Amino acid sequence: MKDITKQKFSRNKLVEMISFALGNLGHAAFYGALSTYFIVYVTSGMFDGLPQSVANKLIGLITALVVIIRLAEVIIDPILGNIVDNTKTRWGKFKPWQVIGAVVSSVLLVVIFTGIFGLAHINWIAFAIVFTVLFILLDIFYSFADVAYWGMVPAISEDSKERGIFTSLGSFTGSIGWNGLTMIVVPVTTYFTFIATGKHEQGPSGWFGFSIVVSIVAVLSALAVAFGTKEKDNLIRNAATKKTSIKDVFSGIIHNDQILWISLAYLMYSLAYVVTNGVLFYFFKFVLGKPNEFWIAGAIATVIGFSTAPLYPVLNKFITRKVLFSIGQMAMILSYLFFIFGKTNMMMVTIGLILFNFTFAQLVVVLSLTDSIEYGQLKNGNRNEAVVLAVRPMLDKITGAFSNGLVGAIAITAGMTGSATAGDISASKINTFEIYAFYTPLLFSILALVIFLWKVKITEKKHAEIVIELEKTLSSGAKKANTSEVNVELEEIFAPASGQKKLLNEVDGNTLTGIGFAIDPEEGNLFAPFDGKVDFTFSTKHVLGVVSNNGLKAIIHVGIGTINMRGAGFVSHYVDGQLFKKGDLLMTFDKKLITKNGYQDDIIMYFTQPENIIDVQQIDNRVVKQGEKIAKLTFRSER
């Protein structure tokens, strides 16, 4: 049989990957324009020509409205997700919303970057009403595009490795779109302002031109996804997935203290990062007096981002996540000292920017949150995969909303609004700017470090211990399910792989007890042993829980010691909740890599509620073929 792990990407798959990656180039650039530079436009050009006192009141009003609307986005996202999920068209469910969302939000972005055609100069009350309606619509259609873009990954590929590549490529181009915007914003706004007025500055006409450029890129990127990818009507898309509400998220956080502390540490880090990132334009323009060199901030962020992402897995082989998080936070803390004490020296600022962007926080937080799933399962019997997936995006939206509010408040308080220049900003206003832009985020970054070191207990070693203890608990049947109805059922088990069948106590190094069997596999493929569904997967990918259509619950564990590989070499061909048929491919694993790391590759299958099993009939130990009937169980089904 051909080892499926050795398949190479076809030309069509490569086109799909490139098309999908291009989608986030414009999508991320659009988000950058909306979340960061729209507020810059509001404070500097939207109310150009109005008395400063009136302009500041309108800036405050718009800033408050943006914060409220962005916070409301957290609540409506699940609703939009349901709408996308229930869409059925000849083009699929995701691509129509990707294109519609991009086109509508892009048109509305251009409209609000005109100052709604100068309506504020005519009637500011009418302006506030129209702006609120337009911004809500813009935010909704942007969210449609966002939900559709990331939601379509399982529709493109059934292979977890491929899905990981799609996601990584999307994140890569997203970084280019986000940081590339920082590099072009000043040249583009200056160019279009010069074309319209003959002045070398960032005026309203320049911001209008900037919005057109961003909108065109966003629409073209969405079209690349629509025409370059193909949605598949596969089992993964039809997996039964429960929608996660905001109530579910907060409930999951409250009942799992590690999710709580990891989330709080990330919230502090994210607040520091987004606030400082949001005011860097003002820093270059009003403190340094060098707006034309603002592109350096984007260039540094791009280079450092490209370096730290591939560097993380290499460093993590020798350095723990907690240490890597600490290194990143210490670098961020030092960066603020360079910004504060070297604010007039471009070299010092450059060093500060390098340190500011040298962080592993997002990677560490994602992995730590993922590991907290097994912690919660061991602690209270609840797995919160959906909650964990929703936590970081929710926190990003919350911090993004507050960032918009803080940036607007900082600009007004420090007098960095309207046609003000660096020469108009007094020393006292610069001090005010520093308090909010640097000292306050410095405090947030210190709190993030303290919380993570003091309260976060999920390390790689601790997680390995939790997984081992959890498997022992599951195999012994220590945690009993709640019984609402009990039926006696019969289930036939078919070999999930070809190889030598063994008893559990015949596997060297196996500490699992209970009822089950093991197979020394001939190949690195794992197939479904009966008709049923995937209940859950450990974050280390080497263990999955399955349940038959008759209610028989089992754990399939690949390898002894493979928990230490942290998922390397394991590729799943399903998502949690997916229904499968006997003989469907569930997983591929690299036998050579497992052996190279000094571990065994035995496939162990055991049943998690042995107290409910009435009778077990197994064939004798011998070489079996995948799909061959090897056991028959009579059990009490709790459903």
Curated annotation (Swiss-Prot):
Bilayer disposition of the protein: Multi-pass membrane protein
Give its localization.
Cell membrane
Q: Which GO terms describe its cellular component?
A: plasma membrane
Q: Which UniProt keywords apply?
A: Cell membrane, Kinase, Membrane, Phosphoprotein, Plasmid, Sugar transport, Symport, Transferase, Transmembrane, Transmembrane helix, Transport
Coiled coil stretches, renumbered: none
* Residue intervals of the PTS EIIA type-1 domain: 505-609
**EC number annotated for this UniProt entry:** 2.7.1.-
Q: What is this protein called?
A: Lactose permease
